[in-house]
Amino acid sequence: MESYAIHASSRIKWQAKLALIIKEGLAKHGVNAVITDNRDKVSDTSLILGPNVWKKVEAKGNYIMFNRKFLGFNAEDVHENVAISWDGFNGRGTFCVSDLDENRLARYVKDEEILDYKENMGGINLLCEQHDLGRSTDWKNINEFYDYIYERYRNVAVRKKISPENVGVETWKQQILKELEDVKTAHILNSTVSAELTIFGIHVASHDIGDPCYALKGKEDKRMELLTYLAHCQWHYSEINNGEWWDKLKKKVGPQLHEI
């Protein structure tokens, strides 16, 4: 019989909370998953909460990753939704998406929030910093990637990191849109910020297949299709608790996100 283990740290609040929700949802499908803080793989299928703590488990393969959501600006979107994928995350994950519901995108993004693409031909090349390389192997470290951007492009500015929770969503939007007024292109390695900037009409240069919006390279006219797809890649805690997500992801099928 297939064994399942949810790798979560009891010392990390969101992991401890979500692990119980996952366990309850799987039980409704007759799947008995144990919760463990073991840093090694202990089951046939591993369920990993986040990409930072469980890299040894990840390296053994056959795992499902629960990671940061792609869409939504409100506190509930941030704290009660996660993207779920097989054997990778962001652009490298397999999200098993089928039967698109065009209305799902509206749960996270209003029509009026999706802005027309901006054309600032002489504008700023916006460098979007991130914690590390993700799973990119093209650079030795994240600073080497930054150096690459500075050497290759002119008029580079670093994106300011502003949290909507600190200033409120509407004030945050105003500040972000003000910063983006003179941006020609945003340069992103593989951060979920690419989805946010795509919504705000910024041309995104994806420098790694791990970027959630890598599939838009040369196909910006497919923006709405990609955003709708991303809405199907993330799940609300209620959908995880009732086991709805498992109906879609119990079988590892479909392309990686960067291949769609």
Regions found by a protein language model. Give the residues of each.
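N-terminal pre-catalytic "stem/leader" segment of glycosyltransferase-like enzymes
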Residues: 1-49, 133-134, 247, 252-260
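Flexible, charged surface loops at secondary-structure boundaries
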Residues: 1, 38-46, 56-60, 117-122, ...
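Short loop/turn segments at strand-loop or loop-helix junctions that form parts
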Residues: 5-9, 66-71, 122-134, 159-162, ...
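Catalytic donor nucleotide-activated moiety binding site of glycosyltransferases and closely related
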Residues: 8-11, 128-129, 133, 142-177
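Short acidic, S/G/P-rich loop/turn micro-motifs used as interaction or catalytic elements
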Residues: 10-17, 53-57, 131-137, 163, ...
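Extended catalytic core of nucleotide-activated donor transferases of GT-like folds
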Residues: 29-79
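Donor nucleotide-activated moiety binding/catalytic core segment of transferases
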Residues: 35-40, 154, 158-212
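Leloir-type glycosyltransferase catalytic cores
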Residues: 79-122, 136, 214-260
